[in-house]
């Protein structure tokens, strides 16, 4: 009878999901041989044990765990076969990868999406012990004919298993503008007492400047039936949208909404639960070529708004050519704040304070001249680091910082890396922070007003830090922290 039941279950699944061999996606057990000790394994950025990852999905906090779902190919080192991978953390720093969360079904795969905790029990799936984690995702058809649509699933065991809502049928049908409309984000809007879903549905037409891209807002009270609320039309919008409310200058009585897309173009405005109105001033949240498809955590416990993105390499062979078992990784989590500047309200991004748990050895110098600093650093070996420096603008014209062969230049008030400028505010005090891992560098200038994320692979034998200048410089603070590996111990029960 046991074998008969198994046969019936598999047969039923196959009948419900034509074109997809579910068992072939159940590959996580084959990941058990990975030790996280590969030469190019990021040491403090999340990467999958094996195979390809891209967009972060469904980022949510629940009962002491941060959940990071992500686009994942469970079969190969390159993009394809999209499922939702899954990892959990108690501190957003140390991660444990779990079984693949949501697998393909029907004639399609599982593209990017979102997750939220259903505290109001709108879906009606909460139990006495657990609130439902509700995930929305794009069901991406594979035959190049059918339209993409938005579907959902829920979990009542803290994200360990999911059940499809309505057997995976469309909960938000294709809106008719673009076959590939995708990447829903849902959140609870307290003032209007409803769920809001934001969805990219149309790209702009380069040949017709007035034909703008389109984002559509929907509302729901049951997480199943959605009503159109409004549209948001902009030239810059393209996939992986997010919308989040932030305090301005930390003031709880002054809040603005931030909308951004996959390339981290953003605008600031107001949202009343029906429509979004912005100042129509478009800004770029990351100046590098790696940061993409970032999303914020829903339901963080301490009112921080924390964001993570995919650090994509333009050359996938960075990992493949070196025979790494994995490909791509995430950015280090960072807080987002809105602050008033002379040029208006701007977004500031800064690494989460939990990074301090990784510090292995710290070097703190205050009021130190550059020549003395170089002598102090000489002979020390640095690999993965968190570096912070501040200085007086009026006393500093130009210098270069040699960070294991990666050259950061400061000249005439701005920073430059790989010929890309990171502008700073016209303030007397200037600061910069640098996170260097084995394959990437993240640079935060002026408390995170200007951020640049890119791939930068230093030669293993180059472990030196130094400051290069034609004149003596004085740093108010120069701090270097050696960072240990997040894979050294499991932080999840």
Task: List each language-model region with its residue ranges.
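Conserved Ser/Thr-centered positions that define the repeating blades of beta-propeller domains
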Residues: 89, 155-156, 217-220, 269
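Short, solvent-exposed loop/turn segments at conserved positions within beta-propeller repeat blades
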Residues: 77-82, 143-148, 206-213, 260-261, ...
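Surface loop/turn signatures of beta-propeller and other carbohydrate-active proteins
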Residues: 17-57, 76-79, 95-127, 159-188, ...
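Beta-rich accessory regions
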Residues: 27-31, 272-289, 297-493
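A short loop-to-beta-strand structural motif that recurs across blades of beta-propeller domains
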Residues: 83-85, 150-153, 214-216, 265, ...
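Bacterial Sec-dependent N-terminal signal peptides
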Residues: 1-17
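Entry beta-strands of beta-propeller and related beta-repeat scaffolds
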Residues: 65-68, 123-137, 192-197, 251-258, ...
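Short glycine/acidic-enriched loop and turn motifs that connect beta-strands
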Residues: 73-77, 140-144, 202-206, 314-315
